Amino acid sequence: MKRPRDYRSLVPELRDDLLAAQIDTRKLAKFSVAVIVTGVPTAGRTETVNKLIEWLDPKYVTVRAFGEDDEDDEYPVMWRYWRALPAFGRIAFYFWGWYGDYMHSALDDSHQAKRRTVRQLERIRRLEAMLSADGVRVVKIHLDLDADTQRKRLKKLRADKLTRWRVTDDDLRLARHHKAVRKAIERCLAASEQRAARWNLIEGADEDYREVRAGEVVRDEMLLGLERAQKTAQVRASKVAKVAPLPRPRIPKVTDDEYDDELERLQARLALLTRRAKFRKYGLVLAFEGMDAAGKGGAIRRITHALDARQYQVVPVSAPTAEERSYPYLWRFWRDVPARGHIAIFDRSWYGRVLVERVRGFAAPADWRRAYDEICEFERELLEHDLIVAKFWLQVSKAEQLRRFKERDEDKLKRFKVDPEDWANRTLYDAYQAAAGEMVMRTNTRQARWHVVPADDKKSARLHILQTLCETIEQGLSG
Protein backbone atom coordinates (compact mmCIF):
# COMPACT_ATOMS: atom_id res chain seq x y z
CA MET A 1 0.00 0.00 0.00
CA LYS A 2 1.26 3.46 -0.85
CA ARG A 3 1.96 5.80 2.04
CA PRO A 4 0.60 9.24 3.10
CA ARG A 5 -0.02 10.81 -0.29
CA ASP A 6 -2.80 8.28 -0.98
CA TYR A 7 -4.33 8.43 2.46
CA ARG A 8 -7.08 10.97 1.73
CA SER A 9 -8.11 9.17 -1.43
CA LEU A 10 -8.32 5.81 0.36
CA VAL A 11 -10.34 6.90 3.38
CA PRO A 12 -13.77 7.61 1.76
CA GLU A 13 -13.94 4.20 0.08
CA LEU A 14 -12.61 2.45 3.18
CA ARG A 15 -15.23 4.14 5.37
CA ASP A 16 -17.99 3.09 2.97
CA ASP A 17 -16.68 -0.49 3.00
CA LEU A 18 -16.46 -0.58 6.79
CA LEU A 19 -19.97 0.76 7.28
CA ALA A 20 -21.44 -1.60 4.68
CA ALA A 21 -19.70 -4.60 6.23
CA GLN A 22 -20.84 -3.52 9.70
CA ILE A 23 -24.46 -3.15 8.57
CA ASP A 24 -24.42 -6.59 6.93
CA THR A 25 -22.80 -8.11 10.03
CA ARG A 26 -25.47 -6.56 12.24
CA LYS A 27 -28.35 -7.70 10.02
CA LEU A 28 -27.06 -11.25 9.70
CA ALA A 29 -26.19 -11.46 13.43
CA LYS A 30 -24.45 -14.82 13.04
CA PHE A 31 -21.05 -13.75 14.32
CA SER A 32 -19.31 -10.95 16.21
CA VAL A 33 -15.92 -9.28 15.90
CA ALA A 34 -13.49 -8.99 18.82
CA VAL A 35 -10.54 -6.73 18.00
CA ILE A 36 -7.50 -6.96 20.30
CA VAL A 37 -5.21 -3.94 19.99
CA THR A 38 -1.74 -4.14 21.54
CA GLY A 39 1.38 -2.10 20.96
CA VAL A 40 4.43 -0.47 22.45
CA PRO A 41 3.97 2.89 24.26
CA THR A 42 3.08 5.83 21.95
CA ALA A 43 2.50 3.52 18.96
CA GLY A 44 -1.02 4.95 18.65
CA ARG A 45 -3.39 2.41 20.16
CA THR A 46 -5.90 4.96 21.45
CA GLU A 47 -5.75 7.13 18.32
CA THR A 48 -6.26 4.12 16.06
CA VAL A 49 -9.26 2.78 17.97
CA ASN A 50 -10.81 6.26 18.12
CA LYS A 51 -10.44 6.63 14.37
CA LEU A 52 -12.00 3.23 13.66
CA ILE A 53 -14.97 4.05 15.88
CA GLU A 54 -15.34 7.33 14.01
CA TRP A 55 -15.52 5.40 10.75
CA LEU A 56 -18.04 2.87 12.09
CA ASP A 57 -21.52 3.26 13.57
CA PRO A 58 -20.61 3.68 17.26
CA LYS A 59 -24.02 2.46 18.48
CA TYR A 60 -22.92 -1.10 17.73
CA VAL A 61 -19.35 -0.83 18.99
CA THR A 62 -18.00 -1.29 22.50
CA VAL A 63 -14.53 -0.55 23.86
CA ARG A 64 -12.99 -2.26 26.87
CA ALA A 65 -9.73 -1.74 28.72
CA PHE A 66 -8.84 -4.20 31.45
CA GLY A 67 -6.84 -3.02 34.44
CA GLU A 68 -6.45 -4.24 37.98
CA ASP A 69 -9.81 -4.74 39.64
CA ASP A 70 -10.46 -6.16 43.09
CA GLU A 71 -13.72 -7.70 41.88
CA ASP A 72 -11.90 -9.63 39.18
CA ASP A 73 -9.75 -11.34 41.83
CA GLU A 74 -12.93 -12.92 43.18
CA TYR A 75 -13.54 -14.77 39.91
CA PRO A 76 -11.59 -17.11 37.59
CA VAL A 77 -9.01 -15.50 35.30
CA MET A 78 -11.03 -15.70 32.08
CA TRP A 79 -14.34 -14.64 33.68
CA ARG A 80 -14.05 -10.95 32.81
CA TYR A 81 -13.14 -11.65 29.19
CA TRP A 82 -16.09 -13.97 28.62
CA ARG A 83 -18.48 -11.43 30.14
CA ALA A 84 -17.11 -8.69 27.89
CA LEU A 85 -17.66 -10.57 24.61
CA PRO A 86 -19.72 -8.77 21.95
CA ALA A 87 -23.09 -10.18 20.93
CA PHE A 88 -23.42 -11.48 17.39
CA GLY A 89 -23.73 -8.57 15.00
CA ARG A 90 -21.56 -6.27 17.13
CA ILE A 91 -17.90 -5.23 17.27
CA ALA A 92 -15.76 -4.84 20.40
CA PHE A 93 -12.31 -3.29 20.74
CA TYR A 94 -10.07 -4.40 23.59
CA PHE A 95 -6.94 -2.60 24.71
CA TRP A 96 -4.56 -5.51 25.31
CA GLY A 97 -7.53 -7.78 26.04
CA TRP A 98 -6.43 -11.18 27.35
CA TYR A 99 -2.85 -10.41 26.30
CA GLY A 100 -2.10 -7.85 29.01
CA ASP A 101 -1.13 -10.28 31.78
CA TYR A 102 0.61 -12.62 29.35
CA MET A 103 2.87 -9.99 27.84
CA HIS A 104 3.54 -8.42 31.23
CA SER A 105 4.71 -11.82 32.51
CA ALA A 106 6.81 -12.34 29.39
CA LEU A 107 8.80 -9.19 30.22
CA ASP A 108 9.70 -10.65 33.61
CA ASP A 109 12.81 -12.86 33.58
CA SER A 110 12.03 -14.67 36.84
CA HIS A 111 11.49 -18.43 36.84
CA GLN A 112 8.04 -17.99 38.39
CA ALA A 113 6.96 -15.60 35.62
CA LYS A 114 8.17 -17.99 32.93
CA ARG A 115 6.12 -20.79 34.45
CA ARG A 116 3.12 -18.48 34.60
CA THR A 117 3.38 -17.59 30.91
CA VAL A 118 3.07 -21.26 29.92
CA ARG A 119 -0.43 -21.54 31.40
CA GLN A 120 -1.38 -18.03 30.27
CA LEU A 121 -0.47 -18.91 26.70
CA GLU A 122 -2.40 -22.17 26.90
CA ARG A 123 -5.46 -20.30 28.15
CA ILE A 124 -5.23 -17.77 25.32
CA ARG A 125 -4.82 -20.35 22.59
CA ARG A 126 -7.74 -22.40 23.88
CA LEU A 127 -9.95 -19.34 24.32
CA GLU A 128 -9.30 -18.05 20.82
CA ALA A 129 -9.83 -21.47 19.26
CA MET A 130 -13.09 -21.81 21.20
CA LEU A 131 -14.36 -18.36 20.24
CA SER A 132 -13.38 -18.72 16.59
CA ALA A 133 -15.25 -22.02 16.34
CA ASP A 134 -18.32 -20.57 18.02
CA GLY A 135 -19.05 -17.37 16.12
CA VAL A 136 -16.47 -14.78 17.21
CA ARG A 137 -14.01 -13.36 14.69
CA VAL A 138 -10.88 -12.71 16.76
CA VAL A 139 -8.87 -9.90 15.16
CA LYS A 140 -5.43 -9.18 16.62
CA ILE A 141 -3.55 -5.97 15.82
CA HIS A 142 -0.12 -5.11 17.20
CA LEU A 143 1.26 -1.61 16.64
CA ASP A 144 5.04 -1.43 16.46
CA LEU A 145 7.35 1.59 16.70
CA ASP A 146 11.07 2.13 16.30
CA ALA A 147 13.12 3.38 19.26
CA ASP A 148 13.90 6.85 17.86
CA THR A 149 10.28 7.68 17.05
CA GLN A 150 9.15 6.40 20.43
CA ARG A 151 11.75 8.51 22.24
CA LYS A 152 10.69 11.66 20.36
CA ARG A 153 7.00 11.10 21.08
CA LEU A 154 7.59 10.52 24.78
CA LYS A 155 9.70 13.65 24.97
CA LYS A 156 7.02 15.70 23.23
CA LEU A 157 4.25 14.39 25.50
CA ARG A 158 6.25 15.07 28.66
CA ALA A 159 7.12 18.60 27.55
CA ASP A 160 3.46 19.64 27.44
CA LYS A 161 1.69 19.91 30.79
CA LEU A 162 -1.61 19.06 29.09
CA THR A 163 -0.31 15.69 27.83
CA ARG A 164 2.26 14.86 30.49
CA TRP A 165 -0.25 12.65 32.31
CA ARG A 166 -0.27 10.24 29.37
CA VAL A 167 3.28 9.09 30.06
CA THR A 168 3.54 6.54 32.88
CA ASP A 169 6.58 5.19 34.68
CA ASP A 170 5.98 1.89 32.89
CA ASP A 171 6.12 3.66 29.51
CA LEU A 172 9.49 5.17 30.37
CA ARG A 173 10.84 1.88 31.67
CA LEU A 174 9.77 0.00 28.56
CA ALA A 175 11.23 2.68 26.32
CA ARG A 176 14.61 2.44 28.07
CA HIS A 177 14.69 -1.27 27.24
CA HIS A 178 13.15 -0.95 23.79
CA LYS A 179 15.21 -3.66 22.11
CA ALA A 180 14.64 -6.28 24.80
CA VAL A 181 10.95 -5.42 25.04
CA ARG A 182 10.53 -5.71 21.31
CA LYS A 183 12.14 -9.15 21.25
CA ALA A 184 9.98 -10.35 24.14
CA ILE A 185 6.82 -9.12 22.40
CA GLU A 186 7.88 -10.77 19.15
CA ARG A 187 8.20 -14.08 20.99
CA CYS A 188 4.73 -13.59 22.48
CA LEU A 189 3.20 -12.85 19.10
CA ALA A 190 4.85 -15.86 17.49
CA ALA A 191 3.80 -18.20 20.30
CA SER A 192 0.17 -17.04 20.21
CA GLU A 193 -0.17 -17.10 16.43
CA GLN A 194 -2.73 -19.61 15.22
CA ARG A 195 -4.75 -20.16 12.10
CA ALA A 196 -8.03 -19.03 13.64
CA ALA A 197 -6.58 -15.82 15.09
CA ARG A 198 -3.56 -14.40 13.29
CA TRP A 199 -1.61 -11.31 14.29
CA ASN A 200 -1.58 -8.23 12.09
CA LEU A 201 1.62 -6.23 12.67
CA ILE A 202 1.26 -2.56 11.74
CA GLU A 203 4.00 0.05 11.81
CA GLY A 204 2.83 2.91 14.02
CA ALA A 205 5.27 5.66 13.04
CA ASP A 206 3.09 6.94 10.20
CA GLU A 207 -0.31 7.88 11.61
CA ASP A 208 -2.10 7.88 8.27
CA TYR A 209 -0.79 4.49 7.19
CA ARG A 210 -1.49 2.98 10.63
CA GLU A 211 -5.15 3.99 10.67
CA VAL A 212 -5.90 2.94 7.10
CA ARG A 213 -4.15 -0.40 7.52
CA ALA A 214 -6.04 -1.12 10.77
CA GLY A 215 -9.30 -0.22 9.05
CA GLU A 216 -8.54 -2.60 6.20
CA VAL A 217 -7.81 -5.42 8.64
CA VAL A 218 -11.14 -4.96 10.43
CA ARG A 219 -13.04 -4.64 7.14
CA ASP A 220 -11.46 -7.79 5.69
CA GLU A 221 -12.26 -9.82 8.80
CA MET A 222 -15.91 -8.76 8.68
CA LEU A 223 -16.15 -9.66 5.00
CA LEU A 224 -14.59 -13.05 5.65
CA GLY A 225 -17.00 -13.61 8.53
CA LEU A 226 -19.96 -12.75 6.29
CA GLU A 227 -18.75 -15.12 3.60
CA ARG A 228 -18.33 -18.02 6.00
CA ALA A 229 -21.59 -17.37 7.86
CA GLN A 230 -23.51 -17.83 4.61
CA LYS A 231 -22.19 -21.39 4.38
CA THR A 232 -23.71 -22.62 7.65
CA ALA A 233 -24.36 -26.33 7.45
CA GLN A 234 -27.81 -27.73 8.14
CA VAL A 235 -28.06 -29.27 11.62
CA ARG A 236 -29.37 -32.81 11.87
CA ALA A 237 -29.96 -35.16 14.76
CA SER A 238 -26.94 -37.38 15.27
CA LYS A 239 -26.86 -41.08 15.87
CA VAL A 240 -25.40 -41.84 19.26
CA ALA A 241 -22.51 -44.27 19.09
CA LYS A 242 -22.44 -47.23 21.44
CA VAL A 243 -20.32 -46.58 24.50
CA ALA A 244 -19.85 -48.22 27.86
CA PRO A 245 -23.09 -48.03 29.90
CA LEU A 246 -23.37 -45.70 32.85
CA PRO A 247 -22.00 -47.12 36.10
CA ARG A 248 -24.75 -48.32 38.43
CA PRO A 249 -23.56 -47.99 42.03
CA ARG A 250 -25.75 -49.53 44.71
CA ILE A 251 -26.93 -47.46 47.65
CA PRO A 252 -28.92 -48.84 50.59
CA LYS A 253 -32.58 -47.99 51.02
CA VAL A 254 -33.66 -46.29 54.23
CA THR A 255 -36.78 -46.22 56.37
CA ASP A 256 -38.65 -42.96 56.91
CA ASP A 257 -37.22 -42.56 60.40
CA GLU A 258 -33.68 -43.28 59.22
CA TYR A 259 -34.15 -40.79 56.40
CA ASP A 260 -35.27 -37.97 58.69
CA ASP A 261 -32.40 -38.50 61.13
CA GLU A 262 -29.73 -38.83 58.46
CA LEU A 263 -31.07 -35.88 56.47
CA GLU A 264 -30.84 -33.64 59.53
CA ARG A 265 -27.30 -34.84 60.28
CA LEU A 266 -26.02 -34.34 56.73
CA GLN A 267 -27.64 -30.92 56.34
CA ALA A 268 -25.99 -29.81 59.59
CA ARG A 269 -22.66 -31.10 58.31
CA LEU A 270 -23.09 -29.21 55.04
CA ALA A 271 -24.12 -26.04 56.87
CA LEU A 272 -20.94 -26.12 58.97
CA LEU A 273 -18.68 -26.80 55.98
CA THR A 274 -20.03 -23.88 53.94
CA ARG A 275 -19.79 -21.51 56.90
CA ARG A 276 -16.17 -22.28 57.72
CA ALA A 277 -13.81 -19.31 57.45
CA LYS A 278 -11.69 -21.27 54.99
CA PHE A 279 -14.65 -21.66 52.62
CA ARG A 280 -14.55 -17.90 51.94
CA LYS A 281 -11.33 -18.47 49.98
CA TYR A 282 -13.02 -21.16 47.93
CA GLY A 283 -16.42 -21.53 46.30
CA LEU A 284 -18.71 -24.26 45.04
CA VAL A 285 -20.20 -25.12 41.65
CA LEU A 286 -22.77 -27.93 41.46
CA ALA A 287 -24.11 -29.37 38.21
CA PHE A 288 -27.20 -31.58 38.26
CA GLU A 289 -28.14 -33.62 35.20
CA GLY A 290 -30.48 -36.56 34.65
CA MET A 291 -33.57 -37.70 32.82
CA ASP A 292 -36.83 -35.80 33.34
CA ALA A 293 -38.46 -36.63 36.70
CA ALA A 294 -35.19 -38.02 38.07
CA GLY A 295 -35.51 -35.85 41.19
CA LYS A 296 -33.03 -33.05 40.54
CA GLY A 297 -35.25 -30.35 42.02
CA GLY A 298 -35.94 -32.30 45.21
CA ALA A 299 -32.25 -33.04 45.71
CA ILE A 300 -31.37 -29.37 45.21
CA ARG A 301 -33.97 -28.26 47.77
CA ARG A 302 -32.46 -30.59 50.38
CA ILE A 303 -29.11 -28.92 49.76
CA THR A 304 -30.34 -25.33 49.87
CA HIS A 305 -32.14 -25.93 53.19
CA ALA A 306 -28.67 -26.15 54.74
CA LEU A 307 -27.26 -23.02 53.11
CA ASP A 308 -27.30 -19.31 53.87
CA ALA A 309 -29.64 -17.70 51.33
CA ARG A 310 -27.13 -14.86 50.86
CA GLN A 311 -24.48 -17.35 49.84
CA TYR A 312 -26.00 -19.37 46.99
CA GLN A 313 -27.83 -19.08 43.70
CA VAL A 314 -29.85 -21.78 41.96
CA VAL A 315 -29.51 -21.46 38.20
CA PRO A 316 -32.28 -23.27 36.27
CA VAL A 317 -31.11 -24.01 32.75
CA SER A 318 -33.57 -24.42 29.90
CA ALA A 319 -33.52 -23.72 26.18
CA PRO A 320 -31.33 -20.69 25.43
CA THR A 321 -33.01 -17.32 25.00
CA ALA A 322 -32.54 -15.16 21.91
CA GLU A 323 -29.89 -13.17 23.80
CA GLU A 324 -28.02 -16.31 24.87
CA ARG A 325 -28.03 -17.63 21.31
CA SER A 326 -26.21 -14.46 20.21
CA TYR A 327 -23.06 -15.43 22.13
CA PRO A 328 -20.72 -18.42 22.20
CA TYR A 329 -22.29 -21.39 23.99
CA LEU A 330 -20.41 -21.19 27.30
CA TRP A 331 -21.06 -17.44 27.74
CA ARG A 332 -24.39 -18.03 29.49
CA PHE A 333 -22.70 -20.22 32.10
CA TRP A 334 -19.72 -17.93 32.68
CA ARG A 335 -22.23 -15.24 33.68
CA ASP A 336 -23.31 -17.28 36.70
CA VAL A 337 -19.91 -18.46 37.91
CA PRO A 338 -19.82 -17.66 41.65
CA ALA A 339 -17.33 -15.43 43.43
CA ARG A 340 -15.12 -16.80 46.17
CA GLY A 341 -17.11 -17.92 49.18
CA HIS A 342 -20.30 -18.36 47.14
CA ILE A 343 -22.20 -21.27 45.64
CA ALA A 344 -23.86 -21.78 42.24
CA ILE A 345 -26.22 -24.73 41.81
CA PHE A 346 -27.06 -25.49 38.18
CA ASP A 347 -30.35 -27.34 37.62
CA ARG A 348 -29.15 -28.71 34.28
CA SER A 349 -25.93 -27.24 33.03
CA TRP A 350 -23.36 -26.71 30.29
CA TYR A 351 -23.67 -30.43 29.56
CA GLY A 352 -26.86 -29.74 27.64
CA ARG A 353 -24.79 -29.44 24.47
CA VAL A 354 -23.70 -33.09 24.66
CA LEU A 355 -27.08 -34.30 25.93
CA VAL A 356 -30.32 -32.70 24.70
CA GLU A 357 -28.71 -30.63 21.93
CA ARG A 358 -26.91 -33.69 20.65
CA VAL A 359 -29.79 -36.16 20.94
CA ARG A 360 -32.46 -33.80 19.59
CA GLY A 361 -30.27 -32.43 16.82
CA PHE A 362 -30.21 -28.84 18.10
CA ALA A 363 -26.41 -28.68 17.76
CA ALA A 364 -24.30 -29.58 14.74
CA PRO A 365 -22.12 -32.69 15.20
CA ALA A 366 -18.97 -30.57 14.98
CA ASP A 367 -20.25 -28.38 17.83
CA TRP A 368 -21.15 -31.10 20.33
CA ARG A 369 -18.04 -33.15 19.52
CA ARG A 370 -15.90 -30.10 20.22
CA ALA A 371 -17.81 -29.39 23.43
CA TYR A 372 -16.21 -32.16 25.52
CA ASP A 373 -12.79 -30.48 25.43
CA GLU A 374 -14.30 -27.01 25.84
CA ILE A 375 -16.24 -28.12 28.91
CA CYS A 376 -13.15 -29.71 30.46
CA GLU A 377 -11.24 -26.45 29.93
CA PHE A 378 -14.12 -24.46 31.46
CA GLU A 379 -14.10 -26.67 34.55
CA ARG A 380 -10.32 -26.46 34.75
CA GLU A 381 -10.62 -22.67 34.93
CA LEU A 382 -13.05 -23.02 37.82
CA LEU A 383 -10.81 -25.46 39.67
CA GLU A 384 -7.70 -23.31 39.23
CA HIS A 385 -9.56 -20.53 41.01
CA ASP A 386 -10.28 -22.85 43.96
CA LEU A 387 -13.90 -23.39 43.04
CA ILE A 388 -14.92 -26.89 44.11
CA VAL A 389 -16.83 -28.67 41.32
CA ALA A 390 -19.31 -31.50 41.94
CA LYS A 391 -21.35 -33.10 39.14
CA PHE A 392 -24.32 -35.42 39.66
CA TRP A 393 -26.14 -37.59 37.14
CA LEU A 394 -29.42 -38.84 38.61
CA GLN A 395 -30.17 -42.20 37.04
CA VAL A 396 -33.87 -43.10 36.96
CA SER A 397 -35.17 -46.25 35.27
CA LYS A 398 -37.57 -46.15 32.35
CA ALA A 399 -40.34 -47.77 34.37
CA GLU A 400 -39.94 -45.44 37.35
CA GLN A 401 -39.86 -42.40 35.07
CA LEU A 402 -43.18 -43.47 33.51
CA ARG A 403 -44.72 -44.00 36.95
CA ARG A 404 -43.66 -40.48 38.02
CA PHE A 405 -44.97 -38.93 34.81
CA LYS A 406 -48.40 -40.51 35.37
CA GLU A 407 -48.39 -39.52 39.03
CA ARG A 408 -47.68 -35.92 38.09
CA ASP A 409 -50.40 -35.91 35.45
CA GLU A 410 -52.93 -36.97 38.10
CA ASP A 411 -51.83 -34.35 40.65
CA LYS A 412 -53.09 -30.81 39.94
CA LEU A 413 -50.22 -29.33 41.95
CA LYS A 414 -47.59 -31.26 39.99
CA ARG A 415 -49.15 -31.36 36.53
CA PHE A 416 -47.11 -28.35 35.42
CA LYS A 417 -43.92 -30.38 35.83
CA VAL A 418 -44.66 -32.56 32.78
CA ASP A 419 -45.01 -31.04 29.32
CA PRO A 420 -44.96 -32.39 25.74
CA GLU A 421 -41.18 -31.93 25.58
CA ASP A 422 -40.76 -34.33 28.49
CA TRP A 423 -42.81 -36.99 26.71
CA ALA A 424 -40.82 -36.41 23.51
CA ASN A 425 -37.58 -36.86 25.42
CA ARG A 426 -38.91 -40.06 26.96
CA THR A 427 -39.16 -41.68 23.51
CA LEU A 428 -35.41 -41.04 23.21
CA TYR A 429 -34.56 -42.56 26.60
CA ASP A 430 -32.00 -45.01 25.22
CA ALA A 431 -30.29 -42.32 23.14
CA TYR A 432 -30.02 -40.10 26.23
CA GLN A 433 -28.52 -42.98 28.20
CA ALA A 434 -25.87 -43.54 25.54
CA ALA A 435 -25.11 -39.80 25.32
CA ALA A 436 -24.83 -39.61 29.12
CA GLY A 437 -22.47 -42.59 29.11
CA GLU A 438 -20.13 -40.88 26.66
CA MET A 439 -20.42 -37.61 28.58
CA VAL A 440 -19.33 -39.27 31.83
CA MET A 441 -16.53 -41.16 30.09
CA ARG A 442 -15.09 -38.07 28.39
CA THR A 443 -15.52 -35.41 31.08
CA ASN A 444 -14.88 -37.33 34.30
CA THR A 445 -11.66 -35.83 35.66
CA ARG A 446 -9.78 -36.28 38.93
CA GLN A 447 -10.92 -32.96 40.39
CA ALA A 448 -14.31 -32.71 38.68
CA ARG A 449 -15.74 -36.19 38.99
CA TRP A 450 -19.12 -37.41 37.89
CA HIS A 451 -21.25 -39.01 40.59
CA VAL A 452 -23.88 -41.33 39.10
CA VAL A 453 -26.71 -41.61 41.61
CA PRO A 454 -29.40 -44.35 41.42
CA ALA A 455 -32.55 -42.25 41.75
CA ASP A 456 -35.48 -44.67 41.67
CA ASP A 457 -35.64 -44.27 45.45
CA LYS A 458 -35.72 -40.51 46.04
CA LYS A 459 -34.86 -40.55 49.72
CA SER A 460 -31.81 -42.77 49.33
CA ALA A 461 -30.66 -40.65 46.39
CA ARG A 462 -30.96 -37.40 48.36
CA LEU A 463 -28.93 -38.76 51.26
CA HIS A 464 -26.29 -40.13 48.91
CA ILE A 465 -25.97 -36.75 47.18
CA LEU A 466 -25.63 -34.88 50.48
CA GLN A 467 -23.06 -37.38 51.75
CA THR A 468 -21.05 -37.16 48.51
CA LEU A 469 -21.26 -33.38 48.48
CA CYS A 470 -19.95 -33.06 52.03
CA GLU A 471 -17.05 -35.39 51.24
CA THR A 472 -16.24 -33.44 48.06
CA ILE A 473 -16.17 -30.12 49.93
CA GLU A 474 -13.97 -31.58 52.66
CA GLN A 475 -11.52 -32.87 50.08
CA GLY A 476 -11.51 -29.52 48.29
CA LEU A 477 -10.86 -27.52 51.45
CA SER A 478 -8.00 -29.81 52.44
CA GLY A 479 -6.29 -29.55 49.05
Label every model-predicted segment:
Residues 1-479:
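Glycine-rich phosphate-binding loop of ATP-dependent small-molecule kinases
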